[in-house]
From Swiss-Prot:
According to the redox status, the Cys-135-Cys-173 disulfide bridge may have a role in regulating protein function by affecting its ability to bind capped mRNA. This is Eukaryotic translation initiation factor 4E-1. The gene is eIF4E1. Mostly expressed in roots, flowers, immature pods and mature seeds, and, to a lower extent, in stems and leaves. GO terms for molecular function: RNA 7-methylguanosine cap binding; RNA binding; translation initiation factor activity. It is found in: Nucleus; Cytoplasm.
Length: 237
C-alpha cells in the first residue's frame, strides 16, 4: 500500500515522549483543556493525553510539503444552544514526519475517544468549519465504519494526506473522524465542490488507499448547511 511507504522508520520507539495521563478526578476540567490535551471516555473519563515533541526529534527532520493542524471538538463542552463549531480547538501543528509520529503516538485514537467527539487534521490556517473561506465552496467524501473500528483507516487517511499521495492534493482541506454511538465516520473535506473531476479522483484514490469496497458519496457543504441530513450525494464512487 502506497501510504505505508512513509518514513515512520526514521523515528525509533525510544524517541517518542511517554504519554502523560492525568488523575481520574479531573472530570470538571475538560472545558479548561490546554493546547495538546484530548479528553477520553470510559473508565478514564477525566484522562487527557498531552503531546510535545522532544528535542531529539529536531535532528535531521523530514519536512512535509504542507504544515497540518490537529483540531479537537470536545463533546463535554458541547450544548444544544452552542453554535456549531464553537467548541473546536486547535491541538498541535506539525510540519515534519517526526513531529507527526510524535503527536500521533501520544494522542488517543478514535476507538478511545468519547462519544460525540470530532477529531480533525487540516492544513495549517484552514479551520474545519463551513464558514472558513477555503472550505466554504467545498464538500466532503464520507466513509462509515463499525463503532471503534476506524483507527487503521484514520491513520491511513492521515498518511495519504500529509504524504501528498492524492493526484489532486491541492484540493484537499483536511479530514475528520466522527465518533458516534452506532458508527464512526471519516470524511475528507475539499475546496471546490463543483470541480467534479478532482473530487471523483480523490474519492477513488481514497478508496484504493484504504481498500474500502463500499460506495461512498460526496456532499456539497452548501447543501449540508441548507438541508442538514437531507442533503443528497452529488458524486458517488
Amino acid at each position: 500500500m502506497v501510504v505505508e511507504d512513509t518514513q515512520k522508520s526514521v523515528i525509533t520507539e525510544d524517541q517518542y515522549p511517554s504519554r502523560v495521563v492525568s488523575d481520574n478526578n479531573n472530570d470538571d476540567d475538560d472545558d479548561d483543556l490546554e493546547e495538546g490535551e484530548i479528553p477520553v471516555d470510559g473508565e478514564d473519563s477525566g484522562a487527557t493525553a498531552t503531546t510535545k515533541p522532544p528535542a531529539a526529534l529536531a535532528r535531521n527532520p523530514h519536512p512535509l510539503e504542507n504544515s497540518w493542524t490537529f483540531w479537537f471538538d470536545n463533546p463535554s463542552s458541547k450544548s444544544k444552544q452552542a453554535a456549531w463549531g464553537s467548541s473546536i480547538r486547535p491541538i498541535y501543528t506539525f510540519a515534519t514526519v517526526e513531529e507527526f509520529w510524535s503527536i500521533y503516538n501520544n494522542i488517543h485514537h478514535p476507538s478511545k475517544l468519547g462519544l460525540g467527539a470530532d477529531f480533525h487534521c487540516f492544513k495549517h490556517k484552514i479551520e474545519p468549519k463551513w464558514e472558513d473561506p477555503i472550505c466554504a465552496n467545498g464538500g466532503k467524501w464520507t466513509m462509515t465504519f463499525p463503532r471503534g473500528k476506524s483507527d487503521t483507516s484514520w491513520l491511513y487517511t492521515l498518511l495519504a494526506m500529509i504524504g501528498e499521495q492524492f493526484d489532486h492534493g491541492d484540493e484537499i482541506c483536511g479530514a475528520v473522524v466522527n465518533v458516534r454511538s452506532r458508527q464512526d465516520k471519516i470524511a475528507i473535506w475539499t475546496k471546490n465542490a463543483s470541480n467534479e473531476a478532482a473530487q471523483v479522483s480523490i474519492g477513488k484514490q481514497w478508496k484504493e488507499f484504504l481498500d474500502y469496497n463500499d460506495t461512498i458519496g460526496f456532499i456539497f457543504h452548501e447543501d449540508a448547511k441548507k438541508l442538514d441530513r437531507g442533503a443528497k450525494n452529488k458524486y458517488v464512487v
